[in-house]
Amino acid sequence: MQTTKNQDDLVRIFKSILKEERFGSQSEIVAALQAEGFGNINQSKVSRMLSKFGAVRTRNAKQEMVYCLPAELGVPTAGSPLKNLVLDVDHNQAMIVVRTSPGAAQLIARLLDSIGKPEGILGTIAGDDTIFICPSSIQDIADTLETIKSLFNYAE
């Protein structure tokens, strides 16, 4: 069993393990990480990581209480690129909706307002984590959508 893996590997595998939504206790997470080669991992380290990455206990599809990392609860850091704050971009025939990390919508909306009409954005309304974008022209909504997606390197 390998015991010297770097911190990036630990974080990547930790997040991968939580995405499985089958670990109900910290000791189960410790055992899974040890099985992945992190022999020096312990419960207190797992507890700190759960807190750092905003993990919560919730019910999975089998109605078991498990730890998970919901995307919308991801905590941005000071070094996070703006594109990491955009979680989803969608639209209908009249409006574009952007979902962001909590607290990031007004920042992203201000950026979108600054590029404004030349890029097809008439205006925005932002809450905490959702932005409604009114395109300058409904006929050109597809172009405006592509502009927004490319601005944040968003790919579905």
UniProtKB/Swiss-Prot annotation:
Organism: Shewanella sp. (strain W3-18-1)
UniProt entry keywords in alphabetical sequence: Amino-acid biosynthesis, Arginine biosynthesis, Cytoplasm, DNA-binding, Repressor, Transcription, Transcription regulation
Compartments where found: Cytoplasm
Function: Regulates arginine biosynthesis genes.
Swiss-Prot/TrEMBL GO biological process terms: L-arginine biosynthetic process; protein complex oligomerization; regulation of arginine biosynthetic process
Short name of any one Pfam family annotated for the protein: Arg_repressor_C
PANTHER family in alphabetical order: ARGININE REPRESSOR
NCBIfam families per UniProt: argR_whole, PRK05066.1
Xref: Gene3D superfamilies: 3.30.1360.40, Winged helix-like DNA-binding domain superfamily/Winged helix DNA-binding domain
Family under the similarity heading: Belongs to the ArgR family.
Main location: cytoplasm
GO molecular-function terms, A-Z: arginine binding; DNA binding; DNA-binding transcription factor activity
GO cellular component: cytoplasm
UniProt-listed InterPro entries: Arg_repress, Arg_repress_C, Arg_repress_C_sf, Arg_repress_DNA-bd, WH-like_DNA-bd_sf, WH_DNA-bd_sf
Keyword Transferase in annotation: no
Protein name: Arginine repressor
Pathway it works in: Amino-acid biosynthesis; L-arginine biosynthesis [regulation]
